[in-house]
């Protein structure tokens, strides 16, 4: 651990930050130090994933929310993954605590043929995506309607992104650099579906709410 309580390292997927809360007098002191350090490389960190290793039992729930919002606004990260840090042995345990998916843009209309949406975060469309329309997002794409155009989630390379719709019938569906084209004449189910990458291939399965909470 670095003497000031914050250790930052880059990796292939983004950044790792390890925080020793016991070296700070308050949560605010830690947050200020973390933002100060990340700000030095803001140009390089923008739009990347931050894996934050910290003893979550030492941070209040409201402060965790504040930490997420501050980092997204100040550093413009795409995603934050929290991992529990076992302070006593100074090793990181592999307890997954959840993913904060980043900024989300809500579109309250139908995206029509010839229109193209692009956003450096998640996109939620309350409406349809018609054939001939395009939607591109660095994060997830959720369509509360029928999806019949071309979509690309995780377009900065995030293969953990998903695409979901009440009626999933895209012309072209792409997650990161993995692409699939819907076959013609295939009867589609009339229930919500979700597409994701598994073992290097895009799979589509029924959306089960409890599974993705």
From Swiss-Prot:
Keywords of the record: Cell cycle, Cell division, Septation
This protein's record includes keyword Cell division: yes
SUPFAM superfamilies, alphabetized: Cell-division inhibitor MinC, C-terminal domain (SSF63848)
Domain of life: Bacteria
Signal peptide as annotated in the record: none
Pfam families: MinC_C (PF03775), MinC_N_1 (PF22642)
Coiled coil, from the record: none
One example of a Gene Ontology biological process annotation: division septum assembly
NCBIfam families (UniProt xref): PRK00513.1-6
Family statement: Belongs to the MinC family.
Listed HAMAP family: MinC
Subunit structure: Interacts with MinD and FtsZ.
Function field: Cell division inhibitor that blocks the formation of polar Z ring septums. Rapidly oscillates between the poles of the cell to destabilize FtsZ filaments that have formed before they mature into polar Z rings. Prevents FtsZ polymerization.
Protein name, as recorded: Probable septum site-determining protein MinC
Phylogenetic lineage: Bacteria, Bacillati, Bacillota, Clostridia, Eubacteriales
